[in-house]
């Protein structure tokens, strides 16, 4: 019995020792232990075709992602982790051509993102992220736009989040 208690104490000691001083990581997230805040500046819409709700939708979605997936506090400016960016492309193009017309159309959204990690500058990046969704050309963009934009935004936010704090 004493041997069992001794082994159990040893295992607990090793676990506590191993966990101290490490970055916390869950759901594949790797954030410096001293990071307490994140700030997200409003994404500017510089695309030639403008969706009036898109800037706010992207900015809010990125904040929501950090709020739901981390313990960081969202602040207006100068966070330990900082994001800013712009919408550089919002376009529709034909992807599959049928007899005399396009059979499928593609909505593409491209973002240019700048990320600053004040606690670990090796994680800083400036990068473009682009995602698309296809839809049947028998429908207008107005009929499918809200759903497609939501799908594309979710994928873009996942990409941005993973690039900044992903532990892959």
Report residues per predicted region.
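Second-shell loop/turn segments in exported
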Residues: 44-51, 139-147
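Sec-dependent bacterial lipoprotein signal peptides
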Residues: 1-19
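A broad detector of the eukaryotic-type serine/threonine protein kinase catalytic domain
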Residues: 12, 43-48, 92, 134
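A structural "domain/chain start" motif
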Residues: 16-60, 64, 71, 162-168
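Surface-exposed short loop/turn segments
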Residues: 68-72, 80-124, 128, 132-146, ...
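Compositionally biased, intrinsically disordered linkers/stalks adjacent to structured regions
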Residues: 146-168
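Short, glycine-/polar-rich solvent-exposed loops and beta-turns at beta-strand/coil boundaries
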Residues: 31-32, 75-81
